[in-house]
Amino acid sequence: MNKKIWALMLVLPLCVFCGGKDNPEPDPDPDPEVKAEIVISGEKEFDVAYEGGSGTLTFTSNVDWTATPDDAWLTVTPASGKASKSPVAVKFTCGENPKLKNRSTYIVLSGTGVEKNVSVTQAGNPMAGAAAEVKDGDKVLANSPLVEKFLTEVTYADKTYKEDTKVFDYYGGFDGKNLTWDNWETDWPDGDKPESYSIRWKKEDMESGKMSLQLSDELGWSGTLEIADGARYVNITNLVPNDKYTFKVTTASGKVLTQGQFTTTGSIHQCFFSGDIKTKSGVTLKGEGARNCRDLGGWKTLDGKTVKYRMVYRGGRLNEKWTPYPLNEQGQKEVLFEGIGAQLDLRGNSDVIHEPAVAGLDHCSPVIEQGGKTMLVNDAAKTKECFEFVVNSLRKGKPVHFHCSLGRDRTGTLSILLMGLLGVREGDIAKEYELTYFAPVGYSVSSSDKKSNPTPIFKNTRKEWVYSDVVPYFWELAGDGTFAEGVEKYLLTVAKVSQQDIDDFRNLMLE
């Protein structure tokens, strides 16, 4: 009995000792938890010139880190590193800012449990959007080089409109090979637009306030264009070929920033008036503005005269019932700068607008549903109204822009009539007519034709539709006479236009 008691007494202290190990006392000096830190030791905000450049940001990091620019226009090196007590240097680089406005982004420095941002702002490019520079003494091409190649290489004989067309031999339009419904908005070569050039001046010569451009030519045209405060250049376009221009840019105080003269070459006076530019997924799309516009001037007649420039223009719509409108505010100013004073709208009931696209223009909209011979015969009274509006506008010294929706069928019909009456050779009228091939969707081919024209291909050559409908009609009226005589006979006997209006039109248009 005593032995059992003694054994129990020996075991109890051991149990107490073992139980004590299950609940140890806390360590009086534990290791402190390390906080993740990135400490920027240099600049936290950087400014870069518009030309591009680089900079270096320095920091320390007690964790592995990455450096990531928030936009693709900025690159960094190195892009990652290990934790270190020593300072780290990361270099960032960017190219020239392609836009007029400043652009800003961040370089994100991050590691497990920590993130810091460093801002980078690049100045806007004052030369963004500047066309190729034209200087005193330069000689430049006025119209599109694509159109120039076609006009200088192709010759059509009279009365051969049923034989062939050569326009598909030239890049720049819907030939069924190069452009599709899907890629035209990004790949369109803009062959219907004239060449643009920029007049530039030195930054150190500038003064605060708006500036102005005075531009004039040897033909007697002149215009003044306001230039925004701080601008370093002004773009000019819609130049007449084979002309001499004088330019001068002045400040509000009258100080001359730059001046000079240049000459132009080319075959046709193309025009473009600005509209709002559209983008898709950051890509600039083609087709904006008032398109398919060209002057009827410059063509030679059979009796050795020349059609005057800046009198009558043909083109696509200047306004419409839906947005975006062809012309923006800048485009409206460009119409007036060109000197256009009257608008003839040939559209039908579905899309005609009975008011001018630009405030102050004289306006006429007779409502014509279809071009071709139908327009000439069934709508002879309205064709007469169109002709009289053109003549009366010219009498008042107001150049006319006439258009339908695309500037193709009804516009083409009236263009054939006007050029034919002036005595331009029919084969040359065919070349002028086919220039619509170089215009984008909505002008050369209709966007509503996707199902019937899936390739797509331009279907309004001289062999088809309007041209092959109107021209033989005028030739038939001419009998053994000239094409001009056939057109005049139509105006006198069918449209009932007065001989006085015909004579005045020729006198006003020819030199």
Predicted regions mapped to residue ranges:
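Short coil/turn motif common to extracellular beta-sandwich-like domains
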Residues: 50-54, 87, 191-199
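Beta-strand-rich extracellular modules
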Residues: 95, 110-114, 250-254
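C-terminal motif of bacterial Sec signal peptides marking the signal peptidase cleavage site
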Residues: 14-18
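Cys-dependent protein tyrosine phosphatase-like superfamily
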Residues: 22-25, 127-400, 414-511
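Solvent-exposed, low-complexity, repeat-rich "mucin-like" stalks and linkers
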Residues: 36-67
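Short, solvent-exposed loop/turn segments enriched in Ser/Thr/Gly
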Residues: 51-57, 97-106
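A short beta-strand micro-motif common to beta-rich folds, especially ectodomain repeats
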Residues: 90, 101-113
